[in-house]
Amino acid sequence: MRLEDIRPQPGSTRRRRRLGRGIAAGQGASCGKGMRGQKARKGGGPRPGFEGGQTPLYRRLPKLKHFPRYVRRPQYTLINLRALAKLPAGSEVSLESLMDLGIVTTNDGPLKILGDGEVGVPLTIRAAAITPSARAKVEAAGGRVELVGSQTASAGS
């Protein structure tokens, strides 16, 4: 095999459109560019973001001063203890088990347990993060908390 023997796969290439070669060619006369105007000339049209001389949006908006602290903050799937109150004693709580039960319907990221509500039965909670109040309520009911995933450093957040 030599370099000049290489051919593209059959059906992978299309013939280029020959513009302005007569009406019967399908792209004759104005070559599919409509009538007249800036967009019909060579060189295309105005640059992206040009609004015809009106002050463009990127100049009307205020400048962004420093970056906010929450730009790289991880997104969590949040759930309160109130939603876990109906679970039977000794059940394991994880994002997968909550989605199977229909308690959580969307996966927005790792699971984070918030402390609103009460839990009366011991539960084993496997979550990426848990608030201190939620941890205290779960452990007071006789449950355990296991931190999973890469978010173990921010366990108390």
From Swiss-Prot:
Looking at the keywords, is Electron transport present?
no
Q: Which UniProt keywords apply?
A: Ribonucleoprotein, Ribosomal protein, RNA-binding, rRNA-binding
Q: Which GO terms describe its cellular component?
A: cytosolic large ribosomal subunit
Q: Where are the transmembrane segments?
A: none
Q: What is its quaternary makeup?
A: Part of the 50S ribosomal subunit.
> Family, per the entry?
Belongs to the universal ribosomal protein uL15 family.
**Protein name stated in the entry:** Large ribosomal subunit protein uL15
Annotated organism of origin: Synechococcus sp. (strain JA-3-3Ab)
Tell me what gene encodes this. Answer: rplO
